[in-house]
Each structure stands twice: as structure tokens, then as C-alpha cells.
Amino acid sequence: MRIMGLDVGSKTVGVAISDPLGFTAQGLEIIPIDEEKGEFGLERLTELVEQYKVDKFVVGLPKNMNNTSGPRVEASQAYGDLLTERYKLPVDYQDERLTTVAAERMLIEQADISRGKRKKVIDKLAAQLILQNYLDRTF
């Protein structure tokens, strides 16, 4: 079963994919989007869904530290609804608190990557962490 993890922002969607057995997550890419123009990167996402034969989506939920939901949670859930409508595949949600912080820390401490390069990979790594946390919790 292939599961696709998504870190949905207002300008990009980080994409990760599980291995066929659902043990590990691998970051794939970052898809540019524009919420204000209604451009959600679905053309590219469709290519990836078909290429990897995706069975399910996991979308990160950026809850506040006190476990309340803010406007980005609603945007992520709306994106999940869009996925369900378009692909007719199940969508689960994974708490993504601090995944971007953890991803940035990994890039600084372990890879010593400059700020400019971090911006180019941070969402992909965050999607990978969201998916890996989901896989660890579920399987």
C-alpha cells in the first residue's frame, strides 16, 4: 500500500511517498501552489499519484501548540476534501506540530545546509516527517 504524505502551505505542497510496505517515508518534491488563484498543483499531484499508484493520502494538520485549530488547519482540511473529491481515495490527517522546526534543525545540524537551500527542501522534508510519524503510529 503506497501512502502519499503532504505538507500543505499557502505557496507550496511538500510531497513524500511511503515504500510499498508502508514502513518508510521518502521526500519527493515540492509543488508550487497559489491558494489565492485557486491553483493547487493537482496536475502534478495527479502525475505522482499515477506514477506511484497511491492508495491513500496523509495530510499534515498544523495545530497550535495548545491543540486548538487555526486557519491553516481549515486550509489543510479543505485540501484533503479536494483530494477525496478528485481521487476518490481515503485521506487521513497527522498532527504536524513542530515538523517544520524539526526539519529545519535536521538540515542545519546534520547537513549544514545554507538558509537559501533550506527553503528549497524544507517542505519536502516536513512532508516526509509527517508521513513517517503517521507510519510509525499506524503500522
Swiss-Prot record:
Entry EC number(s): 3.1.-.-
CDD domains given in the database record: YqgF
A biological-process GO annotation: rRNA 5'-end processing
GO cellular component: cytosol
Molecular function via GO: nuclease activity
Gene3D superfamilies: YqgF/RNase H-like domain (3.30.420.140)
Record localization: Cytoplasm
A family per Pfam: RuvX
Record keywords: Cytoplasm, Hydrolase, Nuclease, Ribosome biogenesis
Family: Belongs to the YqgF nuclease family.
Protein name according to UniProt: Putative pre-16S rRNA nuclease
